[in-house]
Design a protein with these regions (language model features):
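Vicinal oxygen chelate
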Residues: 1, 4-13, 33, 41-48, 64-138
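N-terminal beta-strand motif that seeds the catalytic metal site of vicinal oxygen chelate
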Residues: 1-19, 73-75, 126-138
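Core segments of cupin and vicinal oxygen chelate
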Residues: 2-3, 9-52
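A short, acidic/glycine-rich surface segment
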Residues: 31, 41, 56-66, 98, ...
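Generic beta-structure capping elements
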Residues: 48-50, 57-59, 125
């Protein structure tokens, strides 16, 4: 059934501006764009240890029931330093959605609203690190 995360999709009124903002944050440009990088309606980044995909889609293609206010499920991306990551996000225009919270030993979360209205969660998650270091099944 559910086999793994493939793509996290965010919406933006201005995909080109979101592309620039996320390129600055991630330190890498998108690897995929439609119809092109100059006037995109969709861009996709690969990031992290397992190259998960972050897609940014023009709001014109959002489902009719989609809200324009931040809300819904929060996807948390693992980071090694939540405080430093939140400070970086705030310095480039994000706003605090959920402040830094200690969730127990080895688990810290926080989330921000990006300049395009999406919630971006970050987390230090000891389980994530354990999974990365576990021997791979053959």
């Amino acid at each position: 059934m559910l086999r793994g995360l493939t793509t996290v999709s965010f919406w933006a009124d201005d995909v080109a501006a979101a592309q620039r903002w996320y390129t600055e944050l991630l330190g890498t440009p998108p690897y995929f764009a439609r119809p092109n990088l100059e006037q995109p309606v969709y861009v996709e980044f690969r990031l992290g240890d397992t190259q998960h995909e972050l897609g940014i889609i023009d709001c014109r293609f959002a489902p009719k029931a989609a809200t324009t206010a931040p809300g819904g499920a929060i996807v948390y991306w693992h980071v090694d330093d939540v405080v430093a990551t939140i400070n970086q996000l705030l310095s480039i225009g994000a706003q605090v959605y959920e402040p830094i919270m200690q969730r127990g030993e080895g688990f810290t979360t926080a989330s921000v609203i990006d300049p395009f209205g999406n919630i971006l969660g970050v987390m230090y998650n000891q389980h994530y690190l354990e999974m990365l270091s576990a021997p791979k099944a053959t």
